[in-house]
């Protein structure tokens, strides 16, 4: 592909809304953008005389990107709003080199009350509850469970979803037995109203907890006192000290961005009844050679936090500063929720002051991050191995099996200088050799990029063959992910382990590297590999125990080892065997054997 081909492709652009994609010489996706008019928007990136080149009026980031571009593709849409939604989906799924990806795929809990119930109670949800008389509080970015426990401790509300007679909570004076009509609905709702007020004012709960902690300590019940102390610390963290009087009991949200020293900080305030009830902040390292795009960040931030499957608590959003697609986002959100949603930039007054406060906190978070986290090793890896991304988010893969038995794969995740165990993954595998097993694991992960965004780096436990395999899968996915592999040094075709430290080689797309065993880069990659290995081995051992147990059950039914292996080869695992359709089993191993399996 050449610049001449690109010039011809530019001539095919239509005058309609859509999404455009830029690719480099290797076919790697560089950038995804949206346009109201594809022809006008894409051509604005280029100058055409004397030859096709980057438009010097654009930023250095854009010029650098265009110099790398040799091919473009586009998808037309019915409207610019549709194009924006598709653009956001592509960025999240494919992680293009010149787009910034906010890595926050978590859903946060809400506390809610269902007033359709005769005696409503507090519950936790992460999704929209499809009922008409629901009151939501949140989202709570931490501490939701601690808040709920404190509410039930001090307000004698119904705790069990279904209860027909007084339960243990009534006996210990933690419930007034509404199930047995020992309290009227009117009186019960008065108590509930007090509890909801406390939920919006955590200092009320903290005072009660501090009294309880003191009593426990005086009674020398130090273990329980320590638990209450931890609960107090968590709830105190929820409180935001704001010297701004939000006079009206309003519900709204505030978003602010800050960028400094290659760090992007995003901050979100959730305000209910005039109180800031929760704060969420996120730090994203940005590649040094790429300038940040506030319009792109605000779009991602707001679209992700106002998705259709979570409750809408506020129809007004305040942002610290203007951004290009603000009005378009208003249109999208208003259509999404079938009501008017406003995105505003306040100029004066309390709303302006709270937006300024959000921005100041975003800057402070960058300072804290730089003091608490050292990204030196990531920068060294990027420079030494010529990676495209700063490897802040790393996924590490390993497989484990014993002579083709209990075949499993594992993925561990290292993010922002710590293990992110919420993103660890386990895989039951069908194949028996290392190469096909790794293909199976990597393919399954790549197919999930639309749900869990790709990382900056894949680290594979293996040699060049597995590195090339990973490259093939990443290229086919269209995602922008660097790849490294780590393998034992081989002597006479056998992996060599030196006493006092394994001799490891690092494989990259640029070549093979032998680093000193004292090299910090090698030690860091070994640490990552060892955690993946530990996780895979542990999963393999547990799987093997379960398989041995299940195998003994089938042996007790009179099945031979040959029949059991035949079933496993076909179904992959014992759970699938037990769930299999009788007809399918009968065709595979005969009716008598199938009947034994289904009856037991």
Curated annotation (Swiss-Prot):
Protein localization: Cytoplasm
Description of how the protein assembles with itself and partners: Interacts with UvrB in an incision complex.
UniProt-listed HAMAP family: UvrC (MF_00203)
Main location: cytoplasm
UniProt xrefs under CDD domains: GIY-YIG_UvrC_Cho (cd10434)
Domain GIY-YIG: from-to ranges: 15-100
Location of the UVR domain: 203-238
Listed name of the protein: UvrABC system protein C
A biological-process GO annotation: SOS response
GO cellular component: cytoplasm; excinuclease repair complex
Cystine bridges: none
Xref: Pfam families: GIY-YIG, UVR, UvrC_RNaseH, UvrC_RNaseH_dom
GO MF, any single term: excinuclease ABC activity
UniProt family annotation: Belongs to the UvrC family.
Keywords: Cytoplasm, DNA damage, DNA excision, DNA repair, Excision nuclease, SOS response
InterPro entries, sorted: GIY-YIG_endonuc, GIY-YIG_endonuc_sf, GIY-YIG_UvrC_Cho, RuvA_2-like, UVR_dom, UVR_dom_sf, UvrABC_protein_C, UvrC
Annotated function: The UvrABC repair system catalyzes the recognition and processing of DNA lesions. UvrC both incises the 5' and 3' sides of the lesion. The N-terminal half is responsible for the 3' incision and the C-terminal half is responsible for the 5' incision.
